[in-house]
């Protein structure tokens, strides 16, 4: 390479670098940080570095190119998603084996029973809403990747264990399968979660079981659900395919999502069912309950004919929100008649986070539940009708 070519090469490289840097600097117009981010505590510098790193075009270009190669050549996304056929995406939590899965299973079974005892001591009836895995309802869209063996009978085994502990837990899989056969989409194609239709079906099944086995006090209230609007929904599983903006056309298409809202029908003041101090039904759970996109809380209100106070949390699994609720003032001072615990089956074989809960207290809950389960295993089985789903449904 001659000296002139070297100079030209270096010059072009510097021009390209300066151009890309200038492009990135455009993003700082209007950029601001939180009030607590200062130069002295280092947070301002960190915020600037993070913002620049996110906006630097070379990084975005490289990320998009690598993701496109993975997606088109190997039919793979980032860890977190499993690609199916027909643009269907699944959470890899429904497929992967878990570290110490057998130990986690027993620990979580014991914790559920320990929670039941804690609630019973407060006069609260526990009702489990075990959410079946999306792959259990839509296996026909799977590609070559199959769930690990631990997931095969997880839903049915979960029901069998809570039935042995005499915990009310209606089968949600059967009604969801029937609705699917009837033409309704009960889980979103590119999202982990159920559709508003799926949430409504689950709510109706829960309400029917509660009415049969632990009826609510008082006269029912009338709630009305209305469709607000239908919008294109960017499923949470699409985030594991970082193809936009350069290869947006390769992404599984967005799907329409009907937003619904539920409100109390207009009634006379004398018709109020519960006073302000009463809580007929509480709900603890995950994003299946907490995210308003699915309107699960609203569907429960309408199906139960009762107000529902939600303590569900997004992004923390089913265990942490329950532990937080058991330590709350509402649990101590205003206990509900019924508490619905929404618990996706995929969280059962994993070591769930407990946040800032005292580990010794959590261990005590598990020990109490384990003792009760050991007693149940040593008690002769009374053959009676159970809501445990048939394994043949899987």
UniProtKB/Swiss-Prot annotation:
EC number: 2.3.1.-
Main location (coarse class): membrane
Family affiliation: Belongs to the AlgJ family.
Protein name, UniProt field: Probable alginate O-acetylase AlgJ
CDD domains: AlgJ_like (cd14442)
Lineage of the species this protein comes from: Bacteria, Pseudomonadati, Pseudomonadota, Gammaproteobacteria, Pseudomonadales
Pfam families: ALGX (PF16822)
Membrane topology reported for the UniProt record: Peripheral membrane protein
Record keywords, A-Z: Acyltransferase, Alginate biosynthesis, Cell inner membrane, Cell membrane, Membrane, Periplasm, Signal, Transferase
GO annotations of cellular component type: periplasmic space; plasma membrane
């Amino acid at each position: 390479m001659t000296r002139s070519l070297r100079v030209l090469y270096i010059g072009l490289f510097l021009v390209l670098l300066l151009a890309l840097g200038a492009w990135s600097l455009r993003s700082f117009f209007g950029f601001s940080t939180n009030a607590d981010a200062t130069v002295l505590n280092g947070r301002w510098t960190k915020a600037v570095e993070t913002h620049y790193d996110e906006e630097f075009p070379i990084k975005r270009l490289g990320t998009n190119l690598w993701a496109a190669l993975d997606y088109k050549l190997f039919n793979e996304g980032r860890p977190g998603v499993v690609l199916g056929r027909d643009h269907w995406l699944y959470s890899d939590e429904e497929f992967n084996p878990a570290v110490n899965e057998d130990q986690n299973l027993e620990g979580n079974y014991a914790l559920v029973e320990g929670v039941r005892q804690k609630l019973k001591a407060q006069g609260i009836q526990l009702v489990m809403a075990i959410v079946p895995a999306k792959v259990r309802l839509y296996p026909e869209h799977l590609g070559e990747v199959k769930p690990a063996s631990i997931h095969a009978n997880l839903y049915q085994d979960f029901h069998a264990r809570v039935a042995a502990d005499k915990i009310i837990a209606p089968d949600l899989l059967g009604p969801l399968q029937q609705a699917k056969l009837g033409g309704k989409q009960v889980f979103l194609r590119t999202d982990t979660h159920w559709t508003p239709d799926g949430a409504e079906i689950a709510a109706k099944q829960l309400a029917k079981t509660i009415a049969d086995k632990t009826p609510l006090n008082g006269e029912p209230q009338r709630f009305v659900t209305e469709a607000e609007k239908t919008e294109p929904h960017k499923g949470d599983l699409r985030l594991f395919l970082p193809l936009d903006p350069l290869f947006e056309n390769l992404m599984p298409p967005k799907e329409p999502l009907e937003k619904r809202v539920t409100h109390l029908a207009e009634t006379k003041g004398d018709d109020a069912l519960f006073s302000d101090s009463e809580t007929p039904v509480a709900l603890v759970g995950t994003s299946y309950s907490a995210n308003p996109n699915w309107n699960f809380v609203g569907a429960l209100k309408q199906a139960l004919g009762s107000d529902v106070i939600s303590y569900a949390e997004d992004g923390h699994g089913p265990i942490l929100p329950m532990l937080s609720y058991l330590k709350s003032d509402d649990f101590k001072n205003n206990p509900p008649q019924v508490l619905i615990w929404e618990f996706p089956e995929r969280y059962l074989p994993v070591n769930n986070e407990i946040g800032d809960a005292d580990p010794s207290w959590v261990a005590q809950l598990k020990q109490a539940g384990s003792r009760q389960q050991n007693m149940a295993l040593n008690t002769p089985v009374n053959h009676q009708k159970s809501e445990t789903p048939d394994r043949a449904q899987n």
